Amino acid sequence: MAKYLGPKLKLSRREGTDLFLKSGIRAIDSKCKLDQPPGQHNMRKSRFSDYGIQLREKQKVRRIYGILERQFSNYYKRAARIKGNTGENLLKLLESRLDNTVYRMGFGATRAEARQLVSHKSIMVENRIVNIASYQVVPNTVIKIHKKSHKQSRIRASLELSEQQREKLAWIEVDPIKLQGLFKRYPERSELSANIDEHLIIELYSK
């Protein structure tokens, strides 16, 4: 499946919830009618089958984290091989991606912006440049902005906005002065969005 390059808000409307693809830290403006799917107005909403509901949930989570279909399927397979709850394992793998961790630390206003910082070699993991967005971060890992990127205004702006509006995360510690953060541990399920029903995704792949 090819990467989607169309309007970001259209995807949020399709899923009926803010996917934080464009707005990042701030919620989508109330003018964007998330309860109305994209397309012709005043059309009756179609009812989804169980399979359709499961598929929509998978698409929603895949779009939140900006992952292609094959990648997402591989994450599920990895999660299923790990001891414990497969759904929670899946979310932990997604949350510990480098691009997502950079976003969670507030260095990027959106996951797409964080991914760009990674690909442009602006991110260092344990004092080593890593430009692979899917790199898996492990507990007690220090992530910092490369010195050459310290003057990027978008990083400072994102950090300022993050401090003002984003909820503090217990599994991440950030030093905005040094432009670095610590991934202390994997997040617990209770600390992640309740707007995600990973059980539907597991049911979909278990068929």
UniProtKB/Swiss-Prot annotation:
Any matching Pfam family: Ribosomal_S4
SMART domains recorded: Ribosomal_S4 (SM01390), S4 (SM00363)
GO cellular component: small ribosomal subunit
Top-level division of the source organism's lineage: Bacteria
GO molecular function: rRNA binding; structural constituent of ribosome
Domain S4 RNA-binding: 96-156
Stated family: Belongs to the universal ribosomal protein uS4 family.
Subunit and interaction comment: Part of the 30S ribosomal subunit. Contacts protein S5. The interaction surface between S4 and S5 is involved in control of translational fidelity.
Protein name (Swiss-Prot/TrEMBL): Small ribosomal subunit protein uS4
